[in-house]
């Protein structure tokens, strides 16, 4: 029994942070995909693929520049806000509180080792957060689209 409990604890701990076959990882509702490009180039590529797929890019926030203005240092960090009512509205129809997490955001950042990542909120995590039921198709559609956008921007 003790061995079973220890094994279960280890399994749950390890499953809390996992890497997919494509190198992406998911932890606490955040999907992170490694990029082969720098932060600016990754964000530029993401913006390009988003607009080519009919998404609206509302803004790009360069947190590194903001930190400099405040006299602080921050590794390269940019956020891209984007969306499309045709995609977001079905999720909000499932649960109106989903609107707090829309439009979608993508974080492009450099870690302490110099690696660049593109991170975004996992739609399945958001569905759970907002207690969305019976909307699996809409959640899966958004999840698939975000994964494709991330792949196109990071390769």
Where is each model-derived feature located?
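Compact, glycine-rich, soluble single-domain proteins
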Residues: 47, 51, 55-104, 108
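Beta-strand/loop substructures that line and gate deep hydrophobic ligand-binding cavities in soluble
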Residues: 105-132
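Terminal, regulation- and interaction-focused segments at domain boundaries
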Residues: 21-54, 155
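Positively charged n-region of N-terminal signal peptides that target proteins for export
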Residues: 1-4
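Extracytoplasmic/secreted envelope proteins and their assembly/folding machinery
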Residues: 40-43, 47, 64, 143, ...
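Bacterial N-terminal signal peptides
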Residues: 7-16
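Soluble non-cytosolic domains of exported or imported proteins
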Residues: 33-41, 58, 133-140
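C-terminal partner/receptor-binding element of secreted or periplasmic proteins
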Residues: 124-155
């Amino acid at each position: 029994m003790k061995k079973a409990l220890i094994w279960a604890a280890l399994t749950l701990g390890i499953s809390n942070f996992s890497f997919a076959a494509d190198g992406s990882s998911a932890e606490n509702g955040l999907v992170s995909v490694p990029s082969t490009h720098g932060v600016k180039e990754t964000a530029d590529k993401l913006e390009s693929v988003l607009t080519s797929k009919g998404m609206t890019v509302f803004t790009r926030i360069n947190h590194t520049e903001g930190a400099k203005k405040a006299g602080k240092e921050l590794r390269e960090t940019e956020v891209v806000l984007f969306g499309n009512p045709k995609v977001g509205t079905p999720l909000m129809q499932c649960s109106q509180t989903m609107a707090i997490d829309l439009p979608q955001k993508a974080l492009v950042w450099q870690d302490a080792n110099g690696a660049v990542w593109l991170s975004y909120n996992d739609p399945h995590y958001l569905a759970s957060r907002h207690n969305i039921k019976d909307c699996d198709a809409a959640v899966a559609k958004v999840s698939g689209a975000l994964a494709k956008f991330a792949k196109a921007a990071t390769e």
